[in-house]
Amino acid sequence: MALYHLFSHPIERAYRAGLCSKAALFLLLTTALTYIPPLLVAFRSHGFWLKRSSYEEQPNVRFQHQVLLVALLGPEPEAFLAWSTFPTFNRLQGAHLRVPLVSSREEDRNQDGKMDVLYFKLELPLQPTEHVLGVQLILTFSYQLHRMSTFEMQSMAFLQSSFAVPGSQLYVNGDLRLQQKQPLSYRGLDIRYNVSVINGTSPFAQDYDLTHIVAAYQERNVTTVLSDPNPIWLVGRAAEAPFVIHAVIRYPTEVISYQPGFWEMIKFAWIQYVSILLIFLWVFERIKIFVFQNQVVTSIPVAVPQGEIRKEHLS
């Protein structure tokens, strides 16, 4: 009579031995070699603990309408004109003070509630005998980040240009870029640099000196800089015409560096560990099957229906 395959169920083969046997010692050794070396490999390959991460964010930047201008005149080496929005600075300039006409506007081009660009124009009246050879200009901004930690600071854009021939206009078109010497925190409120770049209440001339202002600003770990201003110097000024500065300053999306939190570090380390562990699990599983099937270490093989081994452990 012909026979047909009617039913089947899997059988698991268990190997039994005493706790003090060579088989138990072998299993303990292979378990240690399975789980510990992947940890060492991941750690020694560098980058196991994520110490710095980054993300993109559009900063919330607003022009504070604070300006400090120094226009270098020629041909006399010490000739200059100066003006700022700080009354004390203006009083200190004496005969060098010259009040310009200033206009500015900011635009939110993509209507996301954050300004994207500043259009700044300054017209400095000049005498027919006065000729501008160089410009030093400071504009201050309020700079905020909110996606990870809340970071607030008052920053500046510093522009300095000088040329060999007198000019009539200066065109500047650049980006206000963030510069970090250290990463930000991943949470909390950071207002350590939310102080005025220029101490407008100080009665001392040193606090308005450009060298002092720039040096103090560069001591910060987080600053902004006017990147790629691409200055265009136009010559040929009419006798009664003012010297004009046109500036277009964009506020681009930034890549922010920050210190990751504990759970982000664990997640990053866990991914590296598991990816290496899977290889070790596969290799040592084959080694254990070979050793026990070929009785390299003495054990008692027992055929057990699938699931019975788990029931024994539970009982």
From Swiss-Prot:
GO terms for cellular component: ciliary membrane; ciliary transition zone; membrane; MKS complex. Keywords: Cell membrane, Cell projection, Cilium, Cilium biogenesis/degradation, Glycoprotein, Membrane, Transmembrane, Transmembrane helix. The keyword Membrane applies. The chain crosses the membrane at residues 23-43, 262-282. Glycans are attached at residues 194, 199, 221. The keyword Ribosomal protein does not apply. It comes from the Eukaryota. It is a multi-pass membrane protein. It is found in: Cell projection, Cilium membrane. GO terms for biological process: camera-type eye development; cilium assembly; embryonic digit morphogenesis; in utero embryonic development; neuroepithelial cell differentiation; regulation of protein localization; smoothened signaling pathway; vasculature development. Disruption phenotype: Embryos die around 15.5 dpc with severe vascular defects. 10.5 dpc mutant embryos have defects in patterning of the ventral spinal cord that are characteristic of defects in Shh signaling. 14.5 dpc embryos exhibit microphthalmia and polydactyly, consistent with disruptions in Shh signaling. InterPro entries: TMEM231. Pfam families: TM231. Part of the tectonic-like complex (also named B9 complex). Interacts with TMEM107. Transmembrane component of the tectonic-like complex, a complex localized at the transition zone of primary cilia and acting as a barrier that prevents diffusion of transmembrane proteins between the cilia and plasma membranes. Required for ciliogenesis and sonic hedgehog/SHH signaling. Belongs to the TMEM231 family. This is Transmembrane protein 231. It comes from Mus musculus.
